[in-house]
Amino acid sequence: MEIIKNKEFGGERPLFASHDLRLENVIIHKGESALKECSNIEAYECVFEGKYPFWHVDKFKIERCLFKEGARAALWYSRDLLMKDTMVEAPKMFREMINLELENVRIPFAQETLWHCHNVRIRKMDLEKADYLFMHSSDIDIKDYRQQGNYSFQYCKNVTISDADIDSKDAFWGTENITVMNSKLIGEYLGWHSKNLKLINCHIGGTQPLCYAKDLILENCTFDEDADLAFEYSSVVADIKGKITSVKNPRSGRIVADEIGEIIIDKNIKLPANCEIIQRKK
């Protein structure tokens, strides 16, 4: 493997079509497509300032690097990435990618990140300003994860999340086969139009959670006081610890909670309209 150390590059495609290359303490200045159409690339303690540095790359490792704000849309149309101990200050990272492993990565401006990505493994990640995160992605395994940003995980499939703190309006809309464990989910309109969403040992906050859901399961979950008007038009099996402020027109299934402040069943309920609702303290 060729090694380039302590160098600086800029302009258009300075390392285009490189193969079997390791970069150490390299700075990629303003320009475009520094490492486009490359394979078997390693970057260690490098700084990326220019746009689109890693497009159409096959097999690459990025460790202890910095992507500055100008390095937007840095990793697209690529596969087989391992990224560790890296700071990303640019938006629109990771698009149309396969086989990503991200460990100890921080993205403080993560808008429109991780779209159309498949087979993703994340361990220890912190994202802020992360609106429209994980759109149309699948086969995702996440642990030790912090996120602030709305409209996340929309239209995702086959996702497992544990030990997460997610602050997101409209999270998990239109998803299929999602399991979230030991996590905090704060944000209104959680999980609408989802299929096979399973929440285990989770805390839920925000108005009108989990409506229009199909085959929804909750095990040993808790609700904030503002998580009212839950389960409207959902088929649900839920075991809730503590109180739910209100439940409205669930379609079918079984809801068990210590206490429910208000149960709203009105003329607008949809068939089969046979959900069993049980309060342990009554």
State what each model feature region is.
Residues 1-282:
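Long, distal/terminal scaffolding or interaction modules
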